[in-house]
């Protein structure tokens, strides 16, 4: 896909990633103060992580901005999102490439997945919801401690 530009945004890119700058249409930014200007220009977010721990905020940020995400199982495991939530879980490089090309070529599907992604974040990853759960848990601990 010659018209596609790939932006690799994030701190501490490896030497192997930095060398990708030599490829036409590949931009490696390194650390940026705010990822949103890059996301607002994107059609799809990709997360080809082989190792990931916990929730990947970068994925939730992309989903919140109505971007479909193609990611590895490792990258998406902490989000608990499924294919009905605007993500494509790619088990192999072949599937990763296929899903990415499909989304790049199909505007309607891309839009639908982006809307699903945003809805998922709104329903499952809002601070108010998590703060309420944390507050309830802390109250339970205080009561349990007081009665112990």
Predicted regions and their residues:
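Short acidic/histidine- and often glycine-rich active-site loop of Leloir-type glycosyltransferases
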Residues: 73-90
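Conserved acidic donor-binding segment of nucleotide-sugar-dependent glycosyltransferases
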Residues: 87-94, 102-107
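Short Ser/Thr-rich beta->loop micro-motif in glycosyltransferases that lines
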Residues: 30-31, 47-52, 74-75
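Nucleotide-activated donor-binding/catalytic signature segment of Leloir-type glycosyltransferases, i.e.
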Residues: 5-37, 44
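Short glycine/proline-enriched, acidic/aromatic patches that form the donor-sugar handling elements
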Residues: 15-17, 35-36, 53-56, 75-80
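A charged, aromatic-enriched C-terminal amphipathic alpha-helix characteristic of glycosyltransferases
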Residues: 108-138
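Short hydrophobic beta-strand element within catalytic cores of glycosyltransferases
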Residues: 58-61, 68-72
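Acidic donor-binding loop of glycosyltransferase active sites
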Residues: 40-54, 65-67
